[in-house]
Amino acid sequence: LFFCCTFFLFLAFNSLSNETGTIIEIDNPKFSEKGLTNNEYEIKAEKGLKSPDGMKLIQVEGKFKTKDDIWIFMNAEIGIFNQTSNNIRLEKNIHFYTDANETISSEFATYDIESGIIELTNNVLFKNNEIEIHANKCTLSNGFEKIIYDGNVLTKISIKNK
């Protein structure tokens, strides 16, 4: 009897530990918030891997509306989305861009959707029609209005003759 009880407890514990480590694959996951706060957004991916730690997203796309009604678009190969804290950590081939022909790219980024702050690191490159800036790190806030560059910063300005 003792052996049977121990065996069933072992099985119960084993199945419980497997449930907490289970990864669920989701095709085309999509997260959005509209109208609840000023921070309207939509994040979608080709595939999601849900685990107790969060949701890993593969081939991520997103769009975020600023307080000034400017849309910021984003894409990356990998993202870790935390809906509770409303932030996304991005990796590999990250690009943020606007309809005003402004783009910024890097290897890693975090985007806090509540505050609207985007932090990019490793091989940061900002481009618009007139300026190209390379940096180690960049922090964006207020849409693309406030940009702070850190580390080795190189700026190229194009002067167009009229």
What would you call each of these model-derived segments?
Residues 1-162:
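Mature-chain termini and adjacent capping regions
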